[in-house]
Amino acid sequence: MGKTVASLGQGTRPDPVRSFNRWKKKHSHRQHQKKERRKQLKKPEWQVEREGISRLMQNYEKINVNEITRFSDFPLSKKTLKGLQEAQYRLVTEIQKQTIGLALQGKDVLGAAKTGSGKTLAFLVPVLEALYRLQWTSTDGLGVLIISPTRELAYQTFEVLRKVGKNHDFSAGLIIGGKDLKHEAERINNINILVCTPGRLLQHMDETICFHATNLQMLVLDEADRILDMGFADTMNAIIENLPKKRQTLLFSATQTKSVKDLARLSLKDPEYVWVHEKAKYSTPATLEQNYIICELHQKISVLFSFLRSHLKKKSIVFFSSCKEVQYLYRVFCRLRPGISILALHGRQQQMRRMEVYNEFVRKRAAVLFATDIAARGLDFPAVNWVLQFDCPEDANTYIHRAGRTARYKEDGEALLILLPSEEQGMVQQLLQKKVPVKEIKINPEKLIDVQKKLESFLAQDQDLKERAQRCFVSYIRSVYLMKDKEVFNVSKLPITEYALSLGLAVAPRIRFLQKLEKQPSTELVKNPVTEAVPPRAPSLPNDEADESPAYVSEKMSVLHKSGERLEETEHRLASGDGDEEQDEETEDEETEDHLGKAREPHTESVVSIEEAQKVKEVSVQFLNRDDDDEDGPDADFLTVKRRDVFGLDLKENEALSKKEPSKSSVKKKLTKVAEAKKVMKRSFKVNKKITFTDEGELVQQWPQIQKCAIKDVEEEDDTGGINLDKAKERLQEEDKFDKEEYRKKIKAKHRERRLKEREARREANKRQAKARDEEEAFLDWSDEDDGGFDPSTLPDPDKHRSSEESESEDTNHKMSDTKKKQETRKRNNTEDDDVRPRSRHGKKAKWETVEPLDTGLSLAEDEELVLHLLKSQN
């Protein structure tokens, strides 16, 4: 019974395989139902992304600056964090820690920090996050505008943006001068983030169709103090007018501005000021060792060469004050071969060449870069060991930016400043006021290498290099003369002659503006050059950065008015009531003192009223010295002095002037290029001529020959410019008469020479003919080869004339064959003689004299018989 129950119990147990299959079927059904429900409940990607953005925005208010050490501590998008991690950016700097949070909250920020502290990422991260929050696409147009003062800085910012933002879907573009404008215009409308320079951006705003910035969300000014100064004033004002008022603005620089006027121009709303190192002991990095040396002007080149020879395995940057200095010294040092690679970077180079130099210097481990101030701001050259300032900077801020190219991101670096004895006191005092620790060091005279003799030999061999040395000399003197701080820069204390010799020049070139200054009377203009008369202003833009801003020259020209007689003429017209407004178009008048220079006198548009003319006197002195180069553009230099008559002391004088009418003599006559050329011709300058001789001392004909004028130009000056066509036609007619007479003489001489040759040929032919007649011999009969002459016995006997026909026929046949041979020989000789004989002018052969009869020594009957025999043989 028990066994039966057990068997029944075992029979009721379910089959495990069958149970597993049923469970699997149910489980699969449940999973399928869950999957279907998830599909129905799944949100679109854009909605999920929007929810993530909202969570990030909620965390912006919770940012605690003291707790942030990495970028991941900020509430940033995954795409931005991934780009930072791939670009090896993990830890944040002080400026990034304090500004990124404020920028993410949508506030306007003015950030200032030491050089090399990471200001570029401080504004690039908020830029990416701002467009990500708005889910910006390429169809939305321009969203962020980043403006840099130089092309190199804009290029560097664009490269960092490409690395950090490569995971985003935004489109970015680089718009700088030196590239194809049409190529940029075709793509600029689809750009979301635009990195540019002010000049090229304004050009696109004026010329590119359908380009606008109405949807702009953020404006970033890198190196804002430089962009907002007078160099870019007009350009930036025009750009800001085209931008919407409602936007976020970020300003970053190592030396920030607090000018209320500049901030009002940008329409900033309650900006946040972030000065990271405002309370620091020094305004430069702590790892930067800074020194200066005192050196005479004529020893600076030797000091530079000795410095390079002693630092062959270092990476250095040498700063100069002008482009022409860089051009000349770069070529000279390449010939001196100091043993290290030398590169040159300045504003007169083509854009592609500038980018090549920039990338090449970044790649090299040991090299020297000769540069102007375009490389002084923002550029991040890795592992720069030395920064040598060959020329004194214009102020302490410029020094800070130059020295900031080394000791970046807590790395070590050294800076050396070369000062003249006249510059030491003023410059060192300014640096100490800016909290820049500098100390003086001495030069080791044993390591100083003098290169003046080598430079002299280079200039003696190369005329082009000599001209560059002259332009370098004038450019340096001009840059010192135009510096606004006359306590530091005094051109009268410079040893000009010794400096010219140190460049390799035998004689110091002429400096026109100094000569003009010496000729002027001792007025207040000379006593107080610029310091007291000109109001303080922002640092001027260097010459090589002027190409970035078309408004650079116009801004400086806007403070100029007419000088000398032109000022008096203006006062006369205003006082006499000619009009309340006067507009003078820009004119280019060449200087009459030097016709080889290209000096222009620009005049700006000015609106002056009578009352203002009575209160204000402006005296402008303009000194120009332009040098044309294959790479250089024209430099415009201006010096402006203003004197205001606040108390109206000159009212009486102006009233007296108002009663007088402007005389014709006071009006300066405009000089055109044609008039200048005529004056040069009247002075009858003797042009140098190059004469080449062979080794034997014979003169080599120069080709092409210089055309000579038979009629001297004695035309008087015309009132109207240009060329008088009537007088030119008359002159050409006179020249044609002379040319025709010369041509007729040449043809006549050519014919005479040909006739003489023909006459000489006829004489030679006559001589040969006479000689041939003298040598001619007469043969009456021909004998065998053994006989040497004529044998009379061979003649037929008249008595035996009718001999046997057989013997006679044989003799006749023999003689006929010999006669034909002789005749062919004579015909051949006659043909050759006929070729030699000259022909008469009418094409007929010349007649010869009658040949006298030969005396054969035979009787008349024998001669007749001989003739008959010969005639019969010919027939």
Swiss-Prot record:
Binding sites annotated in the UniProt record for ATP: Y89, R90, L91, Q96, A113, K114, T115, G116, S117, G118, K119, T120
Chief site of localization: cytoplasm
Sequence ranges of Basic and acidic residues compositional bias: 562-575, 594-604, 734-744, 755-774, 797-831
UniProt motif (DEAD box) ranges: 222-225
Chain residue numbers at which the record places covalent cross-link Glycyl lysine isopeptide (Lys-Gly) (interchain with G-Cter in SUMO2): K652
Domain Helicase C-terminal residue range list: 300-449
Catalysed reactions listed for this entry: ATP + H2O = ADP + phosphate + H(+)
Compositionally biased tracts (Acidic residues): 578-593, 775-789
Stretches with biased composition (Basic residues): 21-41, 745-754
Keyword Nucleus tagged: yes
Documented EC number(s): 3.6.4.13
Assembly description: Interacts with AIM2; this interaction promotes AIM2 stability. Interacts with SCNA; this interaction causes DDX10 mislocalization to the nucleoplasm and cytoplasmic inclusions.
Domains as described in the record: The Q motif is unique to and characteristic of the DEAD box family of RNA helicases and controls ATP binding and hydrolysis.
Protein name, UniProt field: Probable ATP-dependent RNA helicase DDX10
Taxonomic source organism: Mus musculus (Mouse)
